[in-house]
C-alpha cells in the first residue's frame, strides 16, 4: 500500500514538473532509499576527498540494489564533483581517479562545482546560491550543470519517444 501511494504521488508530481530535485543527506538511510525508489534518475555528488571517493562505491552499490529490488527504471545520470579547489593537487588527483574508475560506465559531469566561502555563507543564511550570490562562480557552475542535465533529459525523452514508436 505504501509503495502504491508513493507511486501515485510521484505520478501526480510528474504531470506538473519537468524536473523534481530530491536532495538527500549523505547517508544511506530510509529517506535516501525512498528517494531512490521514487526517482527516475540520480545525480551523485562527491567531493574530491579520499573518504568521499571511497563512499561513492558504497552509494553505487545501494543504487544498484534499489534498481534491482525496487525501481528497475532508476538510472544514474552522472557523478558531480563538488567543492572542488582546482588549484590543489588532491582535487586534481581524486577527480582524475573518479573519472578513470567510473567514467567509462557512468558520466562524470564536465561541470565541477567549485569550493566557495560564498556557498557556505548562503547555506548558513538559508538561501540558495542564486539568491545570495547570483553572479558568483558557484551560481555560474550550477547554471552550467543545469544545461548539462537538461541535455541528458532531452536525450532521455527522445529515447522514450523512439521506444514507444517501436
Where do the protein language model's features map onto the residues?
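Short, conserved glycine- and acidic-residue-centered signature motifs
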Residues: 1, 52-55, 138
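C-terminal lobe/tail of nucleotide-utilizing enzymes
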Residues: 70-166
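Hydrophobic residues within well-ordered alpha-helices
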Residues: 6, 59, 142-145
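Conserved catalytic-core segment of NTP-binding enzymes
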Residues: 14-114
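Single conserved hydrophobic/aromatic residue that forms the stacking wall/gate
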Residues: 1-9
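A periodicity- and composition-biased signal for non-globular, repetitive helical segments
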Residues: 8-9, 53, 154
Amino acid at each position: 500500500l505504501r509503495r502504491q501511494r508513493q507511486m501515485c504521488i510521484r505520478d501526480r508530481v510528474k504531470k506538473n514538473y519537468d524536473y523534481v530535485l530530491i536532495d538527500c543527506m549523505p547517508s544511506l538511510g530510509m529517506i535516501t532509499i525512498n528517494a531512490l525508489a521514487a526517482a527516475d534518475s540520480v545525480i551523485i555528488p562527491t567531493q574530491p576527498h579520499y573518504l568521499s571517493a571511497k563512499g561513492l562505491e558504497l552509494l553505487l552499490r545501494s543504487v544498484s540494489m534499489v534498481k534491482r529490488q525496487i525501481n528497475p527504471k532508476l538510472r544514474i545520470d552522472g557523478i558531480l564533483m563538488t567543492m572542488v579547489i582546482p588549484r590543489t593537487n588532491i582535487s586534481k588527483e581524486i577527480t582524475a581517479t573518479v573519472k578513470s574508475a567510473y567514467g567509462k560506465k557512468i558520466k562524470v559531469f564536465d561541470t565541477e562545482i567549485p569550493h566557495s566561502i560564498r556557498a557556505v555563507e548562503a547555506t548558513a543564511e538559508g538561501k540558495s546560491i542564486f539568491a545570495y550570490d547570483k553572479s558568483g562562480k558557484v551560481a555560474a557552475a550550477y547554471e552550467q550543470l543545469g544545461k548539462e542535465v537538461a541535455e541528458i533529459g532531452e536525450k532521455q525523452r527522445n529515447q522514450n519517444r523512439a521506444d514507444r514508436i517501436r
